[in-house]
Amino acid sequence: MSEVFDLTCDLISRPSVTPEDAGCQAMIAARLERVGFTCEHLHYGSVANLWATHGQGAPVLVLLGHTDVVPPGPIEAWTSNPFIPQRREGKLYGRGAADMKGSVAAFVIAAERFLVAHPGHPGTLAILLTSDEEGQAIDGVRKVAETLRQRGQRIDWCLTGEPSSSERLGDLLRVGRRGSLSATLHVKGVQGHVAYPHQARNPIHLAVPALAALTGRHWDDGDESFPSTSLQISNIHAGTGANNVIPGALEVAFNLRYNPHWSAPRLESEIVALLDQHGLDYTLHWHRSGEPFYTPEGKLRRIAREVLERFSGAPPEESTGGGTSDARFIAPLGAQCIEVGPVNASIHQVDEHVCLADLEALPDLYQLLIERLLAEH
């Protein structure tokens, strides 16, 4: 087929279920070093990270991706083995084909071609890969970003290869992301027999008004760039499984996706104040996954729009929707961040795939973006 097809297949065949890398980064580093990249392997705990750079000085463009994948689930549910790439009906099937080994392969091919055409390019081209994007995201880009911050590393632009397209390659340009804040609420009650409720304190009954207030709260109206903040309860657990026992405790997990009108500390304070109004005996544990970020109108967005329109045939939708990405750790370094990648319809699903035509186009798309940012005068 082609270089990008072969490299994507090579990556898919390595079962790098998070936080495993399965040799993906070593193989990529060897290729990058052959064309003049300086490669640094940053290992934190069980996580592999690769920081590869070519050139020097400003501006600095980072291509950001991950080599880990989500578990495939039952192998028998797949039409073909998820770690044996298979080409069928114009698509390449395998775990990571769309999220995001196809993009990583395209990054490498685009970088190689760019350096052939522009060996003495201005500024710095960097590639940052991690094996901890799909998992806890603690020892991956989060930790690398802190290392880069301590070194005083400047980053001007970050291009993340997450599968951002909706129906066709390049139809959507991700220009920001909402923040993510998770919490686990533990409500204490008193266990007892359901026939003697006066001898017990049912934590479910006690918590229901507070949970109703939480889910009914109108946080904000959003704005032209971000949707409104939302809170969703994801898990509730209480009881022994018997229908004649009042539980002694309740556990509720919930998550907020919030726009820049809020910060994590403000949201935490608001929720604590709301819970305190209901007189619960509770504890609350928070996990801050990342603050929101937004790339304003400027050179990066303008060039990305022009390039995507060339490939998709129409101007892209510019969006801040969807979940989180590792760009949330790069944005606080002062970088403007966008996300451009293949269609996301099959990601994290059985029979994940990428359209072969899109895969073949990705290196050209990324190379043009790199050239417009680093080599255009």
Swiss-Prot record:
Q: In which pathway does it act?
A: Amino-acid biosynthesis; L-lysine biosynthesis via DAP pathway; LL-2,6-diaminopimelate from (S)-tetrahydrodipicolinate (succinylase route): step 3/3
Q: Which cofactor does it need?
A: Zn(2+); Co(2+)
- Which InterPro entries does this chain map to? ArgE/DapE_CS, Bact_exopeptidase_dim_dom, DapE_proteobac, Peptidase_M20, Peptidase_M20_dimer, Peptidase_M20A
Q: Which residues form the active site?
A: D68, E133 (proton acceptor)
User: Does the UniProt entry include the keyword Protease?
Assistant: no
Enzyme Commission code: 3.5.1.18
Q: Which residues bind Zn(2+) 1?
A: H66, D99, E162
Alphabetical GO biological process terms: diaminopimelate biosynthetic process; L-arginine biosynthetic process; lysine biosynthetic process via diaminopimelate
Please indicate if the UniProt record lists Amino-acid biosynthesis as a keyword: yes
Reaction catalysed by this chain?
A: N-succinyl-(2S,6S)-2,6-diaminopimelate + H2O = (2S,6S)-2,6-diaminopimelate + succinate
Quote the Pfam families the UniProt record gives: M20_dimer, Peptidase_M20
- Spell out the molecular function terms from Gene Ontology: acetylornithine deacetylase activity; cobalt ion binding; succinyl-diaminopimelate desuccinylase activity; zinc ion binding
Enzymatic class = hydrolase
Spell out the subunit comment: Homodimer.
- PANTHER family (alphabetical): ACETYLORNITHINE DEACETYLASE, N-ACETYL-L-CITRULLINE DEACETYLASE
The record's listing under NCBIfam families reads: dapE_proteo, PRK13009.1
User: So what does this one do?
Assistant: Catalyzes the hydrolysis of N-succinyl-L,L-diaminopimelic acid (SDAP), forming succinate and LL-2,6-diaminopimelate (DAP), an intermediate involved in the bacterial biosynthesis of lysine and meso-diaminopimelic acid, an essential component of bacterial cell walls.
Question: What is the designated name of this protein?
Answer: Succinyl-diaminopimelate desuccinylase
Q: Provide the species name.
A: Xylella fastidiosa (strain M12)
Its lineage reads: Bacteria, Pseudomonadati, Pseudomonadota, Gammaproteobacteria, Lysobacterales
